[in-house]
Amino acid sequence: MDEGIEKNIFVNLESQIDGVCPKFYVNVDDIDIIHEPPEFYQRLKKLIKKAQKRIFLSTLYIGKEERELINCLSNALSNNPSLHVHILADQLRCTRESPGCCSASLLMQLKKKFPDRCEIKLYHTPNLRGLRKQLVPHRFNEGWGLQHMKIYGADDNLIISGANLSRDYFTNRKDRYYLFSDKGLADFFFKTHFLFSQLSFECIPHLSDSSIQLSSTSPVIPFTLKWNNSCPNPLTNPQEFRVAASAKIQQLLQGNREKFLSRNPSKPLSSVYGSELINQAGDDNNKPFHKYEESAIVYPLFQCVPILTSDVHSTEEKVLSIIGTLLSRKEVNWTLTAGYFNVYPALRKQLLKSEGIGEVIVASQQANGFYRSPGPSKLIPPAYQYIAEQFLKDSRKKKRNIDVLQWQNKGNTYHAKGFWLSTQHHKHPFLTTIGSSNYTSRSQQLDLESTLVVMTQNEKLKRKFSTEIELIKQHTKPMNTCQLEKVPMYVKALTSLMKKKL
């Protein structure tokens, strides 16, 4: 009976998400969960070193001092003449320190050495341009939107994460990392990378005789940004840019769902993009077979509101709404974590309507990357603590069985985000989400985000989901038992005013 409840929930959820976004089937043995920052870095470098055809990295930024990573990419290109490297990052974040040393200037070392086999693309939000861009300080311009996806591919391997490519994310900034060894999924995300690259500026080196120098004493800016795409420039023609971008993205978001829904029902493992499980035993002439117990279903979700017209909708919010509806069932338990916990209103409402057991894992002030930082950013940790306190207070008012746990591990910061769902009589989750989104109003409306829903009935993978949660919870305490730093009244007021930017 209990098995039937979970299977019924699983199948119904699958049928609902099928109509929204692309779908892949991945063998559970081809999914590996990485737990710690140093392991993430070592695995990433290993994938880069072994790559034969392609490396594609979509990230917010590469740390301006990450010479080891750049050298790793350079060595891979030197050792394999057929290898190409494609990097997509955010322009505002990668040029913030310019004309000083910045992420973009570091990347130019690679571009200069391999001009024909290294592509650097920097996305710029259409929301910040003209006089406003000139007036907003560099430290704050990210508040108008970013390229926030974290997709790291090498040949047919893919790491989906929330981590950026900088020193703290390689050492002591806790995040989540899923490694997939699946050609269909890797091909899809390479196409995704290419699509968003077509909506971004190319970053190329300046010739030495035409470098930009602001004054006789200022450093030379070693790069220039060129718009050489077929669609309009987002900084000069934002509306036309959105129309063109929407046309390109719509097929990606929907994943040819008409073709998918009309597929041969006798071969349910054949996805739109060709990712499938094969019967290696050869008993059925290598035809795809359908066994929930041996596979995981993977749905790629995207959030890209700032570059879409009003008639085209992102898939992340739709699918999270479907998942959120499940929380009203008493059989469903859930865990949600976000280093920056400030879920958008519709999701917050669904969480507070949940009938099962719920957990929210948040960063303590000390585990927030902005703790005791200079300037106004030092107010960010108490602001997020206040938001978490308010959520806990509201859940108590509604008599919901929800705990808020604070994560703290001395010398480390916390950046993990994602959902896990399980049923009452099953310890191990059957679903998780993994990716870049913090599920905030800001990420929903301003940033480019990529998330995966991973569902399975395989006990081995479900136990891996459980292990991941347990390792995170090793460093947590219930918020109502912690000695919390007092949040000043002015921070509470500012948080209420600026909530959509957090």
UniProtKB/Swiss-Prot annotation:
Chief localisation class: mitochondrion
Domain of life: Eukaryota
Localization (cell): Mitochondrion
GO cellular component terms given for this protein: mitochondrial matrix; mitochondrial membrane; mitochondrion
SUPFAM superfamilies xref list: Phospholipase D/nuclease (SSF56024)
Residues annotated for ATP binding in this entry: S58, T59, L60, Y61, I62, G63, K64, E65
Organism: Schizosaccharomyces pombe (strain 972 / ATCC 24843) (Fission yeast)
A biological process term (GO) from this entry: cardiolipin biosynthetic process
Enzyme Commission numbers on file: 2.7.8.5
Presence of keyword Lipid metabolism: yes
Active site: H148, K150, D155
GO molecular function: ATP binding; CDP-diacylglycerol-glycerol-3-phosphate 3-phosphatidyltransferase activity
Cited SMART domains: PLDc
Function in brief: Functions in the biosynthesis of the anionic phospholipids phosphatidylglycerol and cardiolipin.
Functional pathway: Phospholipid metabolism; phosphatidylglycerol biosynthesis; phosphatidylglycerol from CDP-diacylglycerol: step 1/2
Catalytic activity, as annotated: a CDP-1,2-diacyl-sn-glycerol + sn-glycerol 3-phosphate = a 1,2-diacyl-sn-glycero-3-phospho-(1'-sn-glycero-3'-phosphate) + CMP + H(+)
Keywords linked to the UniProt accession: ATP-binding, Lipid biosynthesis, Lipid metabolism, Mitochondrion, Nucleotide-binding, Phospholipid biosynthesis, Phospholipid metabolism, Phosphoprotein, Repeat, Transferase
Protein name: CDP-diacylglycerol--glycerol-3-phosphate 3-phosphatidyltransferase
Gene from which the chain derives: pgs1
